[in-house]
């Protein structure tokens, strides 16, 4: 992970079938990298409900995301890759591919 790298932060709730009912995607830039956490300056957010964009807005906030765990992703855009997951209780999670 490098400083000034653009990252996507994801947060949402899903239904029984695993399809997201509500999802929020935030775009941000990494400001600081430590061994067990990263600090991200967030600039833009997009909210979707049932696949439709319901709200899009600009934000100007900085938050720290703590290292949670390393996993081998089985599905999604990072399928077959090892990723580190950082999380923040208010904003969601960031996946960083090795």
PLM regions and their residue ranges:
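Short coil-to-beta transition motif at edge beta-strands of beta-rich domains
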Residues: 1-21
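Enrichment for repetitive, rod-forming helical segments
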Residues: 12, 39, 59-62
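Glycine-centered tight beta-turn/hairpin loop motif at sheet-sheet or coil-to-beta transitions
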Residues: 21-23, 91
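Basic/aromatic-rich interaction segments and small domains that mediate binding to polyanionic partners
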Residues: 24, 29-53
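Intrinsically disordered, low-complexity, charged/polar segments
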Residues: 45-98
């Amino acid at each position: 992970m490098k400083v000034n790298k653009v990252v996507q932060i994801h947060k949402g709730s899903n239904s029984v079938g695993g399809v997201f009912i509500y999802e929020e995607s935030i775009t941000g830039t990494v400001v600081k990298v430590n061994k067990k956490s990263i600090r991200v300056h967030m600039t833009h957010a997009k909210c979707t409900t049932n696949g439709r964009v319901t709200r899009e807005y600009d934000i100007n906030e900085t938050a720290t995301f703590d290292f949670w765990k390393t996993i081998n992703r089985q599905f999604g855009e990072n399928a077959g890759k090892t990723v580190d997951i950082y999380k923040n209780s208010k904003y969601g999670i960031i996946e960083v591919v090795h």
